[in-house]
Design a protein with these regions (language model features):
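Short secondary-structure boundary segments
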Residues: 15-16, 60, 113, 140, ...
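Extracellular/periplasmic Venus flytrap/periplasmic-binding protein
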Residues: 19-22, 28-128, 167-170
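Extracellular/periplasmic periplasmic-binding protein-like sensory domains
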Residues: 124-170
Length: 170
């Protein structure tokens, strides 16, 4: 994007944008018609806060969108973040992280593990026996793109989203 915005040309992007695009790095020629990366995650932080959650473990991939997800959640959640776990983008085995989560004994986890990451994370979270003990809050982890593969492993897990195909909206 930088070459375009530096050329003083308008750029309209349908993709989510890093939160910095709406703050210090805002460019008057860039228009993002989608959401900001931290928006959906803020809603989940607010939900956790209003639901009485006290202790949370955050699990996100270690790249800009993951960092925005964690920051968005923390912006609205004032409870105790007992651990923030940043995993490599594309990670598929979560045995070490699940051991850390179980040891931290949180009320909830907040996960942003999109795509195949989320499919595996949800299945392994359930297989580890954590789904019956720890509230699972997620964004882009349990959604229309991952549910066909997650199936019953995702039952009872909460997902925040800006849209879903099965919403009963006129």
């Amino acid at each position: 994007m930088k070459p375009v915005t530096d050329a003083n040309v308008f750029l309209i992007s349908p993709n989510a944008g890093p939160s910095s695009f709406a703050r210090k790095d805002c460019n008057r020629n860039l228009f993002v018609t989608s959401y900001q990366n931290d928006q959906v995650h803020e809603v989940l932080g607010q939900y956790a806060q209003e639901s009485g959650v006290k202790k949370v473990v955050i699990v996100v991939p270690n790249y800009q969108a993951g960092k925005d997800a964690a920051a968005g959640f923390k912006h609205k959640f004032s409870g105790d973040i007992v651990e923030e776990i940043y995993v490599p983008l594309g990670q598929l085995d979560y045995s070490a992280e699940l051991t850390r989560i179980a040891g931290a004994n949180p009320d909830a986890i907040f996960a942003f593990t999109p795509g195949g990451m989320g499919v595996n994370f949800v299945k392994q979270f359930r297989q580890a026996g954590l789904a019956d003990k720890i509230t699972f809050l997620s964004a882009f982890t349990v959604d229309e793109s991952t549910l066909p593969a997650q199936q019953d492993a995702a039952l009872g897990m909460f997902a925040g989203a800006d849209w879903a195909p099965d919403l009963d909206n006129p």
